[in-house]
Amino acid sequence: MRFFLLAFIPLTTLTVMAQQSQSTDVPSIRSHLCIDVKATLGEGALYCMHDSCLYWVDIEEGILYQCRLPVQHCRRFKLPGRIGTVVRDKNHHAILAMETGIYSLDLHTEELCLICSPAENQTGIRFNDGKCSPAGSLWAGTMSTTGKRKSGALIRISPDGKFTKMIDSVSISNGIIWSPDGTKMYYVDTPTSTVVEYDYNTKADTITNPRIVIRIPHEMGYPDGMTIDRDGNLWIAHWGGSGVYCWNPETGKLLARVEIPAKNVTSCAFGGTDLDTLYITTARTGNSEETLKNYPHSGSLFIAFPDNRGIPSYSFSKPEQ
């Protein structure tokens, strides 16, 4: 089935500065407006080393963006329904967590195919953020579409289509990432304002021994999507916090803040040839008209250049691959 509208969006080179950080005791990093798309709910930033492309989604509008930098345009795919997150396989497919299941989008032919769908009734539930694990499965969270708390979960979806519930009673499943050595997994359930660390077993693709390693003050907003650098520091997008905050999970200390001229910052990913550029998504939803006047580029894609490098993202990989 083909459902897509293909468009090209110009790259913006405008440099912008956010308001002065309230976290005056940590370094402040400047951000730049990269692509002015004004997404309703930008999310799911992912950089793929296989094709040197950045991917992200507008959840509410059902749009997938694919941008090959530094070429100054990106492709826009309009799909039939909300998209919670995007990952890549090792071929030419984007793997999408949509409302009715997990889909594969052929980036060459634009054909959308269902891989698998949940066995249980998903009424009032949608997928949200997610990433591929070192073992090659997709770990994607769910959340209520009506605001009901503890009705979501973190689901592991294997390439053969098997769904396994890994964490239950989640309110807003959000950021998830693995440590550079693959022995830890970090996870965010947004309303808890915490980051939980788990021991991760790559061979079994399982987690054990949860413990809170970061507690985020409410005045800094709420934790949303996140990524990790080669030193093991977490870069967390703060919804309502106008920034991406760098936290040390070993100490729980805040190390730096990337200032973003948007109130609701949603996800981030290291990208570029050397994985030294931080790409940041934002949202227009959840803002008053006055806030949108103060932050007119809300919903756009931003970039920053911290003195840190990320690690490559994992692929949705079938056993034979």
Where are these regions (language model features)?
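Hydrophobic alpha-helical segments and helix pairs
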Residues: L112-D168
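Short loop/turn segments immediately following beta-strands, especially the blade-tip
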Residues: Y198-D205, P306-I311
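Conserved beta-strand positions in repeat-built beta-propeller and related beta-rich domains
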Residues: C48-M49, L54-I59, I95-T100, L138-K148, ...
